[in-house]
């Protein structure tokens, strides 16, 4: 069996209940058909911040062949605090509303029809802006053979060499059962023409194992805001002559540096960042991802002179990053608006301590190959940074970023409105790159 990715947005039903509704109470409820992505709050403007528990239901038919491998359910975003049930049994949960996640549901399935139920607990207030509620980004059904390339398992880093040309390093995570494998890497230029292939053969011991390869490019076309040239790396995984998996990753050749005297340098040249902060909602359309509406927003930004986007104040949809790659928009990708100290009663502070690393891992691993991303922002206006414990959290988040982007495809940063505070300055000194929110009066003093 060869790996398949199937967009899984159709065929869902929805039911809105009170918080704490039991599974046993669901059959008698009124269900109606919905198409994902879905935001249940936007339909009634008098209840845009209403507490409620949304349930999503879908049937999943499975064959014996599919169950011989692994069956994964991937969610690009569910707002928030969701729990998945498969055939009445809890199969996994995820708390943060903006980070992508995946559940391996194989062991809960049987041949024939299976029932999927996703509970989404939305308690207000939980944010400082309109969040929406529900499965507001894409869902993907992933069918995998005995050995396959892990989700977000390809890591690409390109760097210019002193003697000329560029070297690209590729790390591929293989998951599953032991096998003798063959991996073929093929690169395509921005016009779609093949630039050649590179192969490796190895024995995969099973579990998780990373395989590395590298290749050189003499004179690649660089990615920039005016000319966003994108290359494609195709990785094919074989066992003997059988194709197990195939992944296409876009990437770009570019350097991104921050210098205290010269500012931001893209490909060695100073670029003034004309940026805006963009929340994830689409105005009257709500929070449900609509790629055409999102592309329209970004085109308007580009036309008004914007060259940089800050994803305020959370991980963006996968499509936003892809569009910014294609349109030549730089991205400050932000993860959190709060850490352990709350800004609203039911926000992510409830889950941060336990789940911060898995959220950072999801965030970084999904998007680390995108040339548009130049910064990883670990937080916005974080209240914790004025206390000594906030320094410990800063160091921990910084280490997570380096753990999942060790080659430094983008730079860690933080947006702070406490830069006059000594402890906040210590936090900023950890990441070395800080946003001075409402602190223009400190620019000259701190630069000196």
Locate each region found by the language model.
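Accessory beta-strand-rich segments of carbohydrate-active enzymes
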Residues: 5-19, 34, 46-47, 51-152, ...
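Beta-strand-rich binding/interaction modules
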Residues: 86, 165-202, 209-213, 235
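Active-site mouth of glycoside hydrolases
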Residues: 98-106, 124, 129, 205, ...
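Signal that preferentially marks extracellular ectodomain short beta-strand elements
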Residues: 103-107, 212-228
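Short, aromatic- and glycine-rich surface loops/edge beta-strands on solvent-exposed regions
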Residues: 115-118, 227-239
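Short acidic/polar inter-strand loop motif in beta-rich domains
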Residues: 121-127, 238-244, 268
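Low-complexity, Pro/Ser/Thr- and charge-rich linker/hinge segments at domain boundaries
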Residues: 137-153, 254-269
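Surface beta-strand/loop "capping" patches
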Residues: 146-176
């Amino acid at each position: 069996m060869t790996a398949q990715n199937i967009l899984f947005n159709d065929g869902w039903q929805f039911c809105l209940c009170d918080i704490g509704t039991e599974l046993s109470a669901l059959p008698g409820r009124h269900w109606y058909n919905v198409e994902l992505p879905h935001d249940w709050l936007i339909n009634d403007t008098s209840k845009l911040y209403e507490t409620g528990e949304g349930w999503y239901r879908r049937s999943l038919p499975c064959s014996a062949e599919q169950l011989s491998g692994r069956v994964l359910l991937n969610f690009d975003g569910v707002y928030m605090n969701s729990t998945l049930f498969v055939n009445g049994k809890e199969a996994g949960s995820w708390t943060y509303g903006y980070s992508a996640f995946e559940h391996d549901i194989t062991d809960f399935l049987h041949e024939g029809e299976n029932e999927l139920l996703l509970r989404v607990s939305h308690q207000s207030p939980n944010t400082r802006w309109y969040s929406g509620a529900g499965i507001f980004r894409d869902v993907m059904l992933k069918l995998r053979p005995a050995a396959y390339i892990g989700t977000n398992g390809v890591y690409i880093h390109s760097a210019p060499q002193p003697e000329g040309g560029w070297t690209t390093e590729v790390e591929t995570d293989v998951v599953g059962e032991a096998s003798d494998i063959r991996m073929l890497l093929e690169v395509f230029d921005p016009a779609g023409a093949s630039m050649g292939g590179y192969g490796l053969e190895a024995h995969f011991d099973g579990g998780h194992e990373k395989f590395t390869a590298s290749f050189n490019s003499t004179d690649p076309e660089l990615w920039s805001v005016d000319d966003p040239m994108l290359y494609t790396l195709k990785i094919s995984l074989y066992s003997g002559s059988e194709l197990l998996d195939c992944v296409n990753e876009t990437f770009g050749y570019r350097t991104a540096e921050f210098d205290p005297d010269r500012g931001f340098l893209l490909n060695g040249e100073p670029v003034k960042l004309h940026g805006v902060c963009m929340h994830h909602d689409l105005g009257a359309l709500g929070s449900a991802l609509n790629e055409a509406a999102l592309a329209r927003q970004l085109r308007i930004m580009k036309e008004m002179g914007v060259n940089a986007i800050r994803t305020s104040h959370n991980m963006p949809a996968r499509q936003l990053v892809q569009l910014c790659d294609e349109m030549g928009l730089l991205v400050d990708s932000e993860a959190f608006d709060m850490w352990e100290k709350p800004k609203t009663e039911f926000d992510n502070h409830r889950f941060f301590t336990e789940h911060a690393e898995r959220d950072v891992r999801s965030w970084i691993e999904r998007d680390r190959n995108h040339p548009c991303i130049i910064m990883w922002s670990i937080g916005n206006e974080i209240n914790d940074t004025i206390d000594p414990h906030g320094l410990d959290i800063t160091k921990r988040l910084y280490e997570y970023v380096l753990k999942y982007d060790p080659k430094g495809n983008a730079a860690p940063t933080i947006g702070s409105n406490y830069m006059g505070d000594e402890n906040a300055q210590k936090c900023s000194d950890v990441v070395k790159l800080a946003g001075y929110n409402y602190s223009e009066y400190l620019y000259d003093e701190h630069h000196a």
